[in-house]
Amino acid sequence: LPGLEPDWTRIWTYKEAMVPPSLPTSLLVIGSGAIGIEFASFYRALGVAVTVVEVQNRILPVEDEEISKLAHKAFAKQGITIHTGATVKQLSHTQDGGVMARLRTANGNTAEIAVDRVIMAVGITGNVEQLGLEQHGVTVDKGHIVVDEWCRTGATGVYAIGDVVGPPWLAHKAMQEGVLCVEKIAGLEGVHPLDPRSVPGCTYCTPQIASLGLTEAVAREAGYELKVGRYPYSANGKAIALGETDGLIKTIFDAKTGALLGAHMIGAEVTELIQGFAIGKTLETTEAELMATIFPHPTLSEMMHESVLDAFGRALHI
């Protein structure tokens, strides 16, 4: 961002934030996507005073709005200061070795925040500049290489995977792209293209956040008639035994077909739980099959079952 370039000593990218020479006493995180929230949660757990600034009207803007609101509440309870609808207009070095940030707040006012360090967490892009890609028939659009469902570029024999082809910027998505790309080149039978709607996204903060498929808002905008189920951690025996009663499992179904459109979670170990719904969505499992599936007791996974049941008015334990 113009005027907000990292200097790698006081104003960090995610790389410097991974290996700080010393622990700052205060930190400003610009951006509240997965990277920003993970660092905010991590540094707050170490006792750092953390402030998060997000230009959108809520943190974790790509997540389901209900999950985003619960996350905001949880982080605020931990002592993280959050400014949404705000923009960082200027960063300047201070004589004490810190940084002064000038913000435009949601109500249009100007505010200043003095911190030890700043993390720029406004997103990542692959390195595609000045490689001469266009000269060889590879199309680059808005910083990303354009590929088809098999990761083929516009140049014969040239494939691209991972961050350079655009979101979601996830290691497991890039790995699967690499596998299907090589299998397609090798001529293996039964190779399936990657469906981005079946790629689980995980944010490793406290509480954890995980999601899959469409959010409720996006599904409604797409014209689906929905069945939405919810189940709280506070009603699950395993969560109570673990002392982890803050959280929610939310499932979204097509009311006409019973297809699982999305699953959204916040709470302990949801980054492990989400894979169950990823398998179900990949196999095109319906609500009837999920409701008929036996989930072991006592486990956190029972909340997944209860959320599905709740979507169709059949929840058992709430």
Which residues does each predicted region cover?
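A conserved FAD-binding loop/helix module that cradles the flavin
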Residues: 63-70, 74, 161-221, 297-318
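Flexible, glycine-rich terminal cap/loop adjacent to redox cofactors
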Residues: 199, 205-318
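Short glycine/serine/threonine-rich phosphate/pyrophosphate-binding segments
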Residues: 1, 35-39, 45, 127-128, ...
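Rossmann-like NAD(P)H-binding beta-loop-alpha module
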Residues: 10, 21-63, 96, 170
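A short, glycine/Asx- and small/polar-enriched loop/turn
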Residues: 93-99, 155-156, 242-247
